[in-house]
Amino acid sequence: MFKNKNLKLNKFYSLKLLSKLLFLNIILLLIFIYIEKNNNNRIKVCVCTVVKRENKYIKEFVEHYKSYKVDKIFIYDNNDINGETFDDILYEHLKSNYVKILNYRGKEAKQLDKFQNCYNKNKKYYDWLIFYDVDEYINLRNLTNIKDFLRLNQFKKCKSIYLNWVIHTDNNLLYYDNRTLKQRFPKKYMNKKYCNGKTIIRGNINGIKMETTHLLDRKMERCNGFGKIFNYLISLKRKIRI
């Protein structure tokens, strides 16, 4: 009788322990799912751009990339010493430290030197760095967060991503008006042979040498917008675009 009672107790405590372990595993699984779901927040992305006389367009540029969840924008100010400043036009973004201005006012314009500086200083802090001009906007199909794009499995082995330009026409406009660029120039120049573009580069890569504004480091292996490794010279004959 006593032995039978002990067996029942052991069975009861075993089931109780098993239920606790099962509950713990469920909690851990939910935590893992939550972390994976919010993994985008761990990816850090910045934009590096060199600017001169762009005050009419710079705010739209900044807010476009902010809407795409870019974490930081580094603006290399290459305006004339007494030229326009960003104090008013970007006041809120400067105040929040979303935009950082680097003073190159009145200095000789060497865009690649500034790109090199931006990469060397920030490669340890950002997973991806975007080197685009103020008139260059990334537009992704069905995505509003660039981190969702960069986290796609197709880019896991890519050190850099080359995205083709989509050129817009002048829309028969002769004079400036206060509408945004997107509102003023919706029509696209449909040239299927056009394949120029710009590069997004992965951070924390040693030995990067900025040699061209389009490819950045010529020797670096690059992917297209579909994650396929490609040769730039071949792509001149065969357009690759997202």
Indicate where each model-derived feature is located.
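Short beta-strand-to-loop acidic/aromatic patch adjacent to the donor-nucleotide binding site
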Residues: Y126-N139
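Short, acidic, metal-binding catalytic loop of nucleotide-sugar glycosyltransferases
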Residues: E63-K72
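Active-site-proximal specificity loops/subdomain of glycosyltransferases
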Residues: F86-W128
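Active-site beta-to-alpha loop of glycosyltransferases that engages the nucleotide-sugar donor
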Residues: T49-E63, N79
